[in-house]
């Protein structure tokens, strides 16, 4: 399967990517930071998901996992608008099997900046 994951440079996103790679899938990761995964089946795109004009044309994916998130003054632009943008561009296509959204307790509780 072909899997797209946002927020793959560390944490949950990196762990998810490594799991799919271990199972033999092709993974494309998107993150503002440089790649932290080195694998023959991994492609890293260094970009900010808020910048829709930078979204590259990519081959269709079977699974899209929206994992990128921040907890600062940019949270609406990244956590909401960026997630919507990625889903519209890559998740709404014929043949898509799953679109997963990953969030945190901050989405329910919020916090001060």
Where do the protein language model's features map onto the residues?
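Conserved NAD(P)H cofactor-binding loop of Rossmann-fold oxidoreductase domains
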Residues: 67-72
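Catalytic loop of short-chain dehydrogenase/reductase
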Residues: 98-113
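Conserved Rossmann-fold cofactor-binding substructure of NAD(P)-dependent oxidoreductases
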Residues: 46-60
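A short, exposed helix-loop element centered on a Lys and neighboring polar residues
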Residues: 87-88
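Conserved N-terminal Rossmann-fold NAD(P)-binding element of oxidoreductases
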Residues: 3-7
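Conserved glycine-rich Rossmann-like NAD(P)H-binding loop of the short-chain dehydrogenase/reductase
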Residues: 23-37
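N-terminal Rossmann NAD(P)H-binding glycine-rich loop of SDR-like oxidoreductase domains
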Residues: 9-18
């Amino acid at each position: 399967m072909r899997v797209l994951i946002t927020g793959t440079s560390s944490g949950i996103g990196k762990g998810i990517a490594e799991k799919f790679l271990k199972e033999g899938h092709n993974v494309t990761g998107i993150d503002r930071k440089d790649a932290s995964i080195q694998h023959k089946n991994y492609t890293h795109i260094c970009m900010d998901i808020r910048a829709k004009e930078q979204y590259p044309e990519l081959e269709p994916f079977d699974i899209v996992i929206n994992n990128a998130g921040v907890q600062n003054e940019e949270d609406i632009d990244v956590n909401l608008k960026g997630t919507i943008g990625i889903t519209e561009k890559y998740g709404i296509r014929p043949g898509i099997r799953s679109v997963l959204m990953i969030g945190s307790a901050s989405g329910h509780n919020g916090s001060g900046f």
